[in-house]
Amino acid sequence: MTDTQNEAFKMPVNKIRLFEHGAPGSQNLKLTRKYYTEDMPDGRVKHIVQNITDPDIVPYIPDGIGNSTDRQRIPAVLIIPGGAFRRLVYNFEGEDVAKWLNSMGIAAFVLECRLPSDEHDNAEDVPLIDAMRAMRVIRGRAQEFGIDEAKIGVMGFSAGGFMAALLSTAYESDVYADYKYKDEYDKLSARPDFAVCSYPVISIDDCIEAGKRYMSEEQVLEIISDSETKILHKYNPDKLVRPDMPPVFICETDDDRTTLSENSVGFYMAARKAEVSAELHIFRTGGHGYGCGDDFAQTGEWKVLFTKWIKSIGII
């Protein structure tokens, strides 16, 4: 296994490895982790991470918070960036969101998870394995970071939104039951206490049906990669919804032609049918991949709505 850090942009150095003895399913895979930038038409620059075999979480903790018995414990969020199951958009859907959460007094941990596009054993399972392990590690180290272990949520964007939905419904999965290096963290719950899914992909059927409004089915299928197809066929959060899953907040735009709002509507309806507390917002415009959103446009409103929602469920 090779997982180097040839960085085209500066990454934090305080990462927490999720598996000290090698991640299950990747022990024999040799990849060089890649960090690179990608210019966007609007002048912004994406920070991209690829080829992950040794997953980790990057902590972002508000100033003045730490291991102390005389301070009030704060909530925390596991952030899962998107990237079409082939890469991670670290800045817009990771670090920027973490810093915004910190400004609200919420700790954040950005997940650098393995991706199903690489040749891991059981590649469709590795993002879920990493997300479950990340939740357990955060919960196990809650005191160290001054975190309330009963207020740890998950937030994901695009493909990361799928993972947030999946973790919220499949948190008792036995996807790494045979891993021989389990430790005390693995005895802890991987269930998030709340979930946020931003412009998520959820169902491959919804993707195909909605996409046919804009192009032929053949064109839709050409856009969806093999790795996307495999993980979406194996896991459908719509069908995994359960009454004891955490409250969920979902946001999307009506003009998103990448994941399409039908995904968000379907997940919301499945949650409501299971009598799960759910809130859904669909903005008229904003497209796909807006991350924290534009404070001068509709997409920036999701942060305001999220803040009101998280207060309403007693997290802050």
Tell where the protein language model's regions lie, with residue ranges.
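Acidic catalytic loop of the alpha/beta-hydrolase fold
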Residues: 203-204, 255-259
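Short beta-strand/loop motif that positions the catalytic acidic residue
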Residues: 244, 249-252, 256
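Short beta-strand element of the alpha/beta-hydrolase
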Residues: 73-82
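Catalytic nucleophile-loop/oxyanion-hole region of alpha/beta-hydrolase
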Residues: 88-97, 111-149, 295-301
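C-terminal catalytic histidine-bearing segment of alpha/beta-hydrolase fold enzymes
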Residues: 251, 261, 265-316
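Mobile cap/lid helix-loop segments that gate and shape the active-site cleft of serine hydrolases
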Residues: 37-44, 177-184, 193, 200-240, ...
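N-terminal cap/lid segment of alpha/beta-hydrolase-fold proteins
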Residues: 3-72
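Primarily recognizes the serine-hydrolase "nucleophile elbow" in alpha/beta-hydrolase
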Residues: 133-212, 232
